[in-house]
Amino acid sequence: MKDKAYDITIIGGGPIGLFAAFYAGLRGVTVKIIESLSELGGQPAILYPEKMIYDIPAYPSLTGVELTENLIKQLSRFEDRTTICLKEEVLTFDKVKGGFSIRTNKAEHFSKAIIIACGNGAFAPRTLGLESEENFADHNLFYNVHQLDQFAGQKVVICGGGDSAVDWALALEDIAESVTVVHRRDAFRAHEHSVELLKASTVNLLTPYVPKALKGIGNLAEKLVIQKVKEDEVLELELDSLIVSFGFSTSNKNLKNWNLDYKRSSITVSPLFQTSQEGIFAIGDAAAYNGKVDLIATGFGEAPTAVNQAINYIYPDRDNRVVHSTSLID
């Protein structure tokens, strides 16, 4: 289906995309955010939700979740002119009369200008690869942890052997009823000190085992079947929640279909963040230019310039002088 025209469509709902949407709202234009994941926030929200970030201006420290919550709260001021589309991957976009037609895996969208803020590309969790896994996902099977308290008093099973798996196991030790870590190797890939703490903890370690099947009722998993590597031994683990910590894969596979100049996995832009196609801009990690510093703070600075240039492109005859927010918001 093809929807109404928006002034600016932002591809990517991470920190840079969210701030760009806020600034566009500040400038009085309509905005649509298209995000490939099931939630906003990008890498800080998904990959390190509980870890501290120290390089955001005016915040000595804050977590990925806190950063995301603040940006969403900031954007909510303009919810009447902002539309958010989740679980949509942008496949192609084409120049049409009055703007661009954007085709995703779900729908066709129309926009007068586009700002690409998709970071290093769409990323997705590495799954167990088991039948019925998708049925349990986001019910009691999780690929990342946002709130540790949601696992209070539960039997939690964690699959994985990296830093995140070990960190979550240690963090949940005193919150959950029990924590069991399943890893396909005897050796863990996490920091040595963390592994030492894990081995000295009350967390149950099952190595080397691999997941073989999930059993449950409806949308809730109840048991994980695991098998010892190179042996016939099979165990069934009862669980209330299952955390799969195999990491995430990133991909800009659709970039080649966007007909834009790019280097490696980033889009080449001008000093005003214009891509090789007029009316399309790129910011954040998605943008490549000489001297680029890949920081969230850098992307925050790029967003207003890209938004202002997009507005100039859409409304060239309008008085587009930039006004400070103190003059616009009481």
Swiss-Prot record:
The keyword Transcription regulation does not apply. Gene3D superfamilies: FAD/NAD(P)-binding domain. GO terms for molecular function: ferredoxin-NADP+ reductase activity; flavin adenine dinucleotide binding; NADP binding. Homodimer. It comes from Streptococcus pyogenes serotype M1. This is Ferredoxin--NADP reductase. Its cofactor is FAD. Belongs to the ferredoxin--NADP reductase type 2 family. Its EC number is 1.18.1.2. It comes from the Bacteria. FAD binds at residues 35, 43, 48, 90, 123, 285, 326. Keywords: FAD, Flavoprotein, NADP, Oxidoreductase. Binds 1 FAD per subunit. It catalyses: 2 reduced [2Fe-2S]-[ferredoxin] + NADP(+) + H(+) = 2 oxidized [2Fe-2S]-[ferredoxin] + NADPH.
